[in-house]
Amino acid sequence: VGSVYIVGASTVLGLCISIPIVFFVNIYLKKDSKLANLTRLSFDVLYGIPSIVYGAFAFTIMIFFGLRTSLLGGIIVITLLIIPIFVRSMDEVARQLPKELLDATYSLGATRLEAIKVAIRQIAPGIATATLLSVGRAIGDAAGVMFTAGFTDSIPTSLNQPAATLPLSIFFQLSSPTPEVRERAYAAALLLTIIVLILSIIGRMITYRFSKNKIK
C-alpha cells in the first residue's frame, strides 16, 4: 500500500511539473536556444544523480527541520527522482515535432495554448513512455525512501506516518531468520515483477493507440 501511495502521488506531481517545463522549452523558447540547452543540461545532470543521494539530501533537510520519516517525505523524494526522467523522455519526443505542424497551427490563428493542445496529441506516446519509465523507476527504488519514508508493518493513514514500500519490505524480510518471513519476501518480489509487467503492457497499448494520431 505504501508503494501505491508514494508512486501514485509522485507520478501525478511529476507530470504536473514536467509537462509545463517541456512545453516551455520547446514551444515558448526556441528549441536550440541557450536557455533551452541549459535547461536540458541541468536535467541531464539531475538524471545521473543516484537515488541514495536524493534520499540522503532529503534526510539531512528533514533532520534540520526536526521532521521524522513519513509518507510525505517519500513522495517528495520520489517526485524529485522521476522529474528528470519525465523531462528527458518527453523532451526527446517534443523535439521531433514537425516545425511545419506548429507553423500551420499558428497560421490558422491559433493561440499558444491551442498549439500546446495540438502538440500534446502528438507527443502523447512520449508522455505514456515517460510515465512507464518513471513508475518503473519509482516502484523499484529502495535507497531514496529508506531515508525518508521509513518502514512500518501498518498501513499509513496520514502523510505524517511512516510508509513501507515493496522493495524495502523485500530487503528487510529477506534478512529474517524465519522461513515464513522470507517466503513473504519472495511473494512480494513476485508481486513487484507482475506489477512492472502489467505496467509495461498497458504502456505499450497506450503508445500504440496514440501513435495512430501522430503526424509523421
Which residues make up each language-model segment?
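Transmembrane-helix boundary motif in ABC transporter permease subunits
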Residues: A9-F43, G203-K212
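Interhelical loop and adjacent transmembrane-helix boundary motif
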Residues: V145-T193
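Periplasmic/extracellular loop-to-transmembrane helix junction in inner-membrane transport proteins
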Residues: V1-V12, D32, F172-E183
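Generic hydrophobic transmembrane alpha-helix motif, especially the helices
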Residues: D44-T79
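Intracellular coupling helices
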Residues: R88-Y106, L113-R121
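Glycine/proline-centered hinge or cleavage motifs at structural transition points of membrane proteins
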Residues: P50, L108-G109
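Transmembrane alpha-helices
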Residues: R112-T148
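C-terminal transmembrane helix and the adjacent membrane-cytosol boundary/short C-terminal tail
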Residues: D91, R95, K117, F172-K216
